[in-house]
Amino acid sequence: MSDPRYQIDVSVVTRYLKEQSDPENSRFAFAYTITVQNNGSLKAKLLSRHWLITNGDGEVEEVRGAGVVGQQPNIDPGQSHTYSSGAVISTRVGTMQGSYQMFAEDGKRFDAEIAPFRLAVPGALH
């Protein structure tokens, strides 16, 4: 059972960006909006991100970086932080998953897992 002080939930909404994609050159662009919800009892700061982006051919790109879109937000208990970003993959379908490294106000570092989510061109999946 996880410690209720460090409870971060992540939800994702994705969108295919047809106008930024070029299927003839294997370029498929997607936007995603992520909400990081602090359901724990302590304030937590989002320090960094770690992504695994997998295309439909099974090729994996690993991305690490500080914060999200140039920010390292502090999220109070019961509050959330929402941001939008994007990814480009070389196939019509792919997935993203990963984690955020968090720093709680009591000094503990912990990971908030981001469950796999799908990037898919509309109509690419049956």
Swiss-Prot record:
Residues 2-126 form the ApaG domain. It comes from the Bacteria. One of its GO terms (biological process) is error-free translesion synthesis. Signal peptide: none annotated. PROSITE patterns: APAG (PS51087). Pfam families: DUF525. This is Protein ApaG. The gene is apaG.
